[in-house]
UniProtKB/Swiss-Prot annotation:
Protein's UniProt name: Alpha-tubulin N-acetyltransferase 1
All residue ranges annotated as the N-acetyltransferase domain in the record: 1-177
GN (gene name): mec-17
Lineage: Eukaryota, Metazoa, Ecdysozoa, Nematoda, Chromadorea
One Pfam family recorded for the sequence: Acetyltransf_16
Primary role: Specifically acetylates 'Lys-40' in alpha-tubulin/mec-12 on the lumenal side of microtubules. Promotes microtubule destabilization and accelerates microtubule dynamics; this activity may be independent of acetylation activity. Acetylates alpha-tubulin with a slow enzymatic rate, due to a catalytic site that is not optimized for acetyl transfer. Enters the microtubule through each end and diffuses quickly throughout the lumen of microtubules.
EC numbers on record: 2.3.1.108
Organism: Caenorhabditis briggsae
Amino acid sequence: MQVNADLRPILGPQLVRLDPMRIKQLQDPQVYDAIDSLAKLSAHCLQLRTPLTTCEKLINSDSTLYLSWKYDEEEKVSRLLGFAKVGRKKLFLYDAQMQTYEGEVLCLLDFYVHFSTQRQGVGKQILDYMFSQEHAEPYQLALDNPSVTLLGFMSQKYGMNRPVWQNTNFVVFDELFQSLSAENGVGTVDFQSCKYRIFNSEKSPPDGWRRPMTPRRLGTGMTDTRWLQHAVSGHQSKGNAMAAPVDADMTPQGALSNRAHQAKARKAHILSSKPLW
C-alpha cells in the first residue's frame, strides 16, 4: 500500500508498534487511509464483508497494531508491507484431554502481508517483533479463527504443528498446555504475558463453555457429560482436528486453492442457512 509522502518523521523505524494512544496521536489522514486500505485487502482475502481492522476501531479498543513499512528513496514514496493486530482476551480453553483452563491470552486478531511482498520474510519479521515487544513465546499465542494458510505458516516458521481448536473458534497450540503444571488438579501458573487457572477435573466446566452438540446422560439431579473421542477429534480434511498435525500447501497455487475452498464452503453455508425474512 503506497503513500506519496515520507513517513519516517511520523512512524520512525520500519517495524513500529502502534497502540491506541499512538494511533490517535498520528493525526495524519494519509496514514489512516493507508492502514484502512491494507486492512480491506486482508478482509478481501478472508471473504469478509467488512474489515476486521480500522484506525477508528483501534483507537476505541485495547488492541495493538504492529506495522511493517519502508521508504523508497528512488520513487520518494512510502509503502506499507503488512501488519498484525493483537489483543489480550480472557478465554476458557480445553486441552486435548478436555481439561479446562481459564486465562488472559495474547490473541492474533488480524494478520496480513501485502501480496507484492509475500514470501519474503515480512510476516515472520512482524511476528518476531511482536513477540519481543509483548514478551511472549509463539506457543502462548491464540489465533482467532485462522485460515489453513495461517496454520501452515505457524507450523513452517515456528514449529507449531499441533493446533487445538476451541468451541469459540480460537486456536491454541498443544505446547501451551504442556508448559502448564498443576498440583492436585488445581493450580495457577504466571507468565509475563499470561495467567492461567486450571479447574478441578471433578467440577463441570463453566456454564456456556461446554462443547456444543455433545450427548448427555441425565442422572439423579446432576448432568454428566460423555465425550465421544471421534466427535472431539474432528475431521482432518477440514484442517481443524484436535491436536492433529497441520498439512497445508504453502505454494502460491496452494494458498489460492485454500482461499477458494474456504470461500466455497462459506457460500454453501450461507445458501443453506434459513433466511431471516
